[in-house]
A protein has these predicted regions:
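Pre-Walker A (Motif I) flank of P-loop NTPase domains
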Residues: 2-5, 77
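Small-molecule kinase domains that catalyze NTP-dependent phosphoryl transfer to phosphate-bearing small molecules
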Residues: 118-162, 167-179
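Conserved substrate/cofactor phosphate-moiety recognition/catalytic segment
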Residues: 21-64
């Protein structure tokens, strides 16, 4: 059986990337960290001249993410997916690509004040994104597990996720939360 997919889903500045790196550090097998942000940085939003261009770039980023995930899913690596997707159809399409593996959907959250504080220290984030995203219904779903990064360090969150995966083994297709 191939290793699991752990999907880290939450608003900007919640700590998904830090959590993914901590998960890699204690992974039982080599783990790929695939983040939507890696594709988003291929374009600069300020260069977009219309809402249509922004939307076209967003869909291209999501398609590129799914294309890479489709290749990695055929490997023997564990997959750590770092997503801020709010569009339900894009999220479901992405999860569907991963559906041949045991999958765990982990909500990564923190109080809005913590998100805003973290956001203020990031050069790659505009102000207000954390507040807007924290109230989005996309992040109020039934997750397999929720990690509050205001009360868990990345290492502590990674241990909690690893314990959950070990205590709730899955084979093949994901839970009803995923695809």
């Amino acid at each position: 059986m191939k290793p699991a997919v752990i999907v880290l889903h939450g608003p900007t500045s919640a700590g998904k990337s830090s959590l993914a790196r901590a998960l890699q550090d204690i992974a039982p097998v080599p783990a790929f960290h695939v983040a939507l942000d890696a594709f988003v940085t291929m374009s600069r939003r300020r260069d977009m001249r219309s809402p249509e261009e922004v939307q076209q770039a967003y869909h291209l980023h999501c398609e590129n993410l799914r294309s890479v995930l489709a290749r990695v899913v055929d490997s023997q690596f564990e997959i750590l997916v770092d997503l801020v997707l709010r569009d339900e159809s894009e999220l479901q399409n992405t999860l569907r690509v991963l559906s041949g593996r045991p999958m765990y959907l982990v909500g990564v959250q923190a109080p809005v004040e913590v998100l805003e504080e973290r956001e203020s220290h990031r050069e790659d984030r505009g102000g207000g994104m954390a507040r807007e995203q924290s109230t989005n219904p996309a992040f109020r779903r039934n997750y397999d597990l929720v990690i509050d990064t205001s009360t868990h360090s990345p290492e502590g969150g990674a241990i909690a996720i690893r314990n959950f995966v070990r205590e709730h083994p899955r084979h093949g297709n994901p839970s009803g939360n995923a695809a």
